[in-house]
Structure formats: structure tokens, C-alpha cells
Amino acid sequence: EGLMDESIDVEVNRRLLDESYDLIISIGQVVPHEVVGMANYSKNIFVGCGGSNMINKTHMLGAFYGLERIMGRDFSPVRKVFDYAEENFIKDMPLMYVLTVTTHTEEDGVIIHGLFIGRERKIFEEAVALSQEKNLEFVEKPLKKVVVYLDEQEFKSTWLGNKAIYRTRMAIADGGELIVLAPGVRRFGEDMENDRLIRKYGYVGRMKVLELYKQNEDLQNNQSVAAHLIHGSSDGRFSITYAVKHLTKEEIEGVNFNYMPYEEAVKKYNPEKLKDGFN
């Protein structure tokens, strides 16, 4: 589609190339993912143990292509990059993938539905098929209002907290509303530079970020931030409200989100009384 024509460096941790290892075991969960479509398999190597160029540029590639066309699907543009790198650069590496498909319930905790072990892409495809069955929820019609609660101890930034957007946006109706209860969020980026760039540009939508990316060197040098800004916007399709304790109304609205005081939000949407699913 001509959205990206840059080269991508294939870099992995040098320890993986140490020939004294006769087996390298990569363990992980296959689950829907906003950048690659379905997480794990070779992503564990090229991103989990990869260099910054690969991480940044594949995040940008996924953002350029669009989350709605990627989430929960195999053979995304990013996955094709990983497949090419696997076939052309590391096929002699003594890798064994151990892939799981799991769900979680309050009653039973983590349930393992599948365990897939081997090196061939076929085992990943089998895990993908099972994960699509177990980890994707389909709704009969788009949702007008969605409330997400972010654990106070786990989510301290919108960099992580915006998973609330990634994981719900395909189910939310045009003109709908997403309310994110985020008692622990106190900054935007996980580091100072990312935080600065998010505050500078905001979550202004895919087309605007692509325009800003072409015009601004600081975004070009921080492609993962540019990708994050794209993923963190609804592109004007539905409203996003952050209910927080530690950021001001001006800070939240400054990055293009709506603001609600946390105490006001929990009076309406008490996470201790609401249950997962429809209420």
C-alpha cells in the first residue's frame, strides 16, 4: 500500500547466537495482539530479544497498517517481517517454541487449553486457531458504553493503560463511549522522553500522527511513540474518558482525552459492584 518503505534491521541478543547452546527454549502465551495480530512465536525472539530498530519499525508498520486490520489475525504485515527474518536469518538456531493458550476466571484462575511445542510454523498456526476461539469475544452488536478498570498497582501510565483502548475499540459503536478507571495512572510515558513526546503531540488520530511523523524528527527518531499515539486514539469514532487521581484535567485534556475525577467516576461505576461483561 506504500505506507512504509524503510529498511528494518534484524537484530537479536548476541547470547542467542552463542554456539555453545544446543537448545534455546522460548516459552510464551499466544493471544491477540495489537501490533502483530497474535502474540508470541518468533515475536519472542525478534522483539522480546530484539534490537530497538526492529521493535520501533515493526510497531510503526503495524500502526501504519491499522489495528483493526491486525488484531486477532495471523499473517499481518508485521508477522510477515518476523516470518521472513526467521526463514532467512535464524533457521539454524536451535530454537524450540513452547506456546500456550490460556484463559482466566475468578473461580478457576488460569486454565491452560493448549500446549504447542516445536519449531515449525504449523504449531503456531494451531495455537492461533485455538486462541481465536478462546481469547476473542464477539458481541451481537457494537457497544455504546464500555467501562474498563485498570489495576492500581499494575498500570501507572497511559503507555500501558491504553490497552483499555486497544482491547475494546473493535467492539465499541460509532459515537460510543469508553470510560477508563485508572487510579494508578500518574504519567503518560514509561520514561521521561516518551512522556514528553506524548504530552507534546497527544493522541490525535492515525492520519494526524502520520502527518506529524513526516514533519518532526523527534517522532521519526521515536517510532514506537508515534505508533503508540496512533493506537491510543479512536480516530474520532468514539469518546475516551480517563478517570484519574494523579493527573490534572488540563493534563488529560492536553493529550486529547476527556477527563473525569476518579471519585466521581467510581460513584457511577463502582468496580467492586460491577462484574465482567454486561451490567
Where are these regions (language model features)?
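An acidic, phosphate/nucleotide-engaging active-site surface
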Residues: E1-G37, I252
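Mobile "lid/hinge" segments at catalytic clefts and subdomain interfaces of large enzymes
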Residues: Q29-P32, A39-V98
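Non-transmembrane, aqueous-exposed alpha-helical and coiled segments at domain scale
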Residues: V147-W159, P271-D276
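Structural motif
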Residues: I25-I27, K145-Y149, I179
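C-terminal non-catalytic interaction/assembly regions of soluble proteins
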Residues: G161-N279
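Short coil/turn connectors at secondary-structure junctions
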Residues: E19-L23, P32, N40-Y41, G50, ...
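Membrane-embedded hairpin module used as a gating/binding unit in multi-pass transport
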Residues: E68-E154
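Short helix/loop capping segments that flank catalytic or ligand/cofactor-binding pockets
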Residues: S26-I27, H33-V36, M54-T58, E106-G109, ...
